[in-house]
UniProtKB/Swiss-Prot annotation:
Entry EC no(s): 3.2.2.23, 4.2.99.18
Disulphide bridges, residue numbers: none
Protein name as annotated: Formamidopyrimidine-DNA glycosylase
The UniProt record lists the keyword DNA damage: yes
Active site: 2-3, 60, 283
A GO term, aspect molecular function: 8-oxo-7,8-dihydroguanine DNA N-glycosylase activity
Entry cofactors: Zn(2+)
Name of the encoding gene: mutM
Similarity section: Belongs to the FPG family.
Amino acid sequence: MPELPEVETVRRGLEQKLNNFIIKKVEVCRDSTVAFPNKKEDFIGGLNNSLLYKWNRRGKYLIAELKKLGNENGRFPLEKFSKNNGFLIVHLRMTGYFKFINNSAQPCKHTRIRVFDNKNNELRYIDVRSFGQMWWIKEGLSPNKIIKGLGSLGPEPFSKDFDEIYLKKVISKRTKSIKAILLDQTIVAGIGNIYADESLYSAGISPFREARTIKKNELIKLKESIVTVLKNSIGSGGTTFSDFRDLEGENGNFGLQTNVYRRTGKECRKCGNLIERKKISGRSTHWCPKCQK
């Protein structure tokens, strides 16, 4: 599943590529991709003649601010001659990704949503396993109330609210493993299997440790490791092990730099011990038994 760095890579690509992209036509190729409104016709009607004004990210959610253009559309700056039109929100889930296509051509087999501008450029959403979802939340409605997962997210790893004091507070009585805690989106937003493993390795903490046993100095190191690992991955365009692509169809390169993730049986880059793998809460976990205590 795309995690924070992959979603942030997509967000940056969308923001750069879709400058002044005005939606003139929407085609829903798979109804189940539209999570809200209940009728796809309302989803299509809500997006038509909207400016994709600004792209944000919250955890693993992409959030586009929309502007509805009036009679003066075509005048610049467009946002001055328009009114707010709510949000287009996307969760890529397991295999979803966007592709920008100049002079739109026939859709591929797994195309789920097609969005066109008046120049026949297309923003195409492709999803092999079809778990990804989109919401059009009209102006006046609360995205956090409509999308349960969005409203329950914990702080962003880069925010000032995510520090060792916060971590100590949320784990002080937790008997769960620290790996399970990091995967809990209500505790910290955006971290998944790859970056939990890599951050714990960088911090020298065993993924099997009970969260409540981790000391303050270890929490400081863990927080710093999380931020560093995520920033490094964003700088590399995220990680591609299966379906993730950026807007240009390119793979992320961080997978070439991982220290433990998917390196089972290979030598630890620090100590030479072999990397091991075991499941925690149904998720494959990779670690170095010598470097992580």
